[in-house]
């Protein structure tokens, strides 16, 4: 896995997002880390809604400390993380380039159907500030699909099996690179606003 993140994969957990926060609060933070689970039992969805489990998904949370100016809350973080996840998916499957889009602020969509999303939270612990990004991507719908919103999955779109470990690996690589090198916040903002912007333009913001 990417050396920036201390990564751990779990068979099952209640929520990678909640577990990441719990670990920091218990004093377990020793640098940026990531948690993924093959199955979540109480995942967190958008606006406090329960996570809808597709049956085969990327459920991944990233946790890192922020200091100085970086510690100021910024509502743009979900969009920035979503852009990096979008780039990672296109790297994994280039044929997604013309169809994978970001619905502001944090939904990844294909043909107006939700493929996944990102949640970002920030909290303080013992005088330090931490940020946690939860990432969920539908890889294959095995369970019944939700009736409340149209959804899709990567396997159906690609028409072939999806390697979950490779998708996770690429997300870790791109997000690590983005967090380490992103300087041009204006460029990231422009990419968020222009849903038709070529994804390769994001490399200019991350030094790729």
Give the positions of each predicted feature:
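Catalytic palm active-site di-aspartate
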Residues: 96-112, 137
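A structural signal for short, well-ordered beta-strand segments
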Residues: 60-62, 106-108, 118-120, 133-139
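N-terminal lobe of the biotin/lipoate ligase/transferase fold
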Residues: 1-98, 116, 124, 161-162, ...
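Short glycine- and Lys/Arg-enriched binding-loop motifs that mark or flank ligand-binding interfaces
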Residues: 39-44, 108, 130-132
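Conserved, helical-rich catalytic subdomain that frames metal- and/or nucleotide-binding sites
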Residues: 159-208
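Short, acidic (Asp/Glu-rich) active-site segment that either coordinates a divalent metal cofactor
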Residues: 127-158
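Flexible loop/coil segments at beta-strand boundaries within sensory signal-transduction domains
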Residues: 111, 122-127
């Amino acid at each position: 896995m990417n050396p920036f993140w201390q990564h751990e994969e779990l068979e099952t957990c209640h929520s990678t997002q909640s577990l990441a926060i719990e670990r920091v609060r218990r004093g377990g933070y020793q640098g940026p880390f990531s948690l993924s689970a093959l199955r979540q039992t109480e995942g967190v969805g958008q606006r406090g809604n329960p996570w809808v489990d597709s049956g085969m998904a990327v459920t991944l949370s990233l946790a890192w400390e922020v200091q100085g100016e970086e510690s100021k809350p910024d509502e743009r973080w979900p969009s920035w993380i979503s852009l990096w996840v979008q780039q990672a998916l296109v790297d994994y499957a280039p044929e997604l380039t013309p169809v994978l889009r970001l619905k502001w602020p944090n939904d990844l969509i294909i043909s107006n159907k939700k493929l996944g999303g990102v949640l970002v939270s920030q909290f303080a612990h013992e005088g330090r500030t931490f940020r946690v990004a939860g990432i969920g991507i539908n890889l294959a719908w095995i369970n019944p699909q939700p009736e409340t919103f149209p959804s899709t999955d990567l396997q159906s779109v690609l028409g072939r099996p999806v390697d979950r470990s490779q998708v996770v690996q690429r997300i870790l690589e791109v997000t690590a690179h983005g967090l380490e090198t992103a300087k041009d916040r204006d460029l990231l903002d422009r990419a968020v606003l222009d849903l038709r912007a070529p994804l390769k333009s994001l490399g200019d913001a991350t030094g790729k």
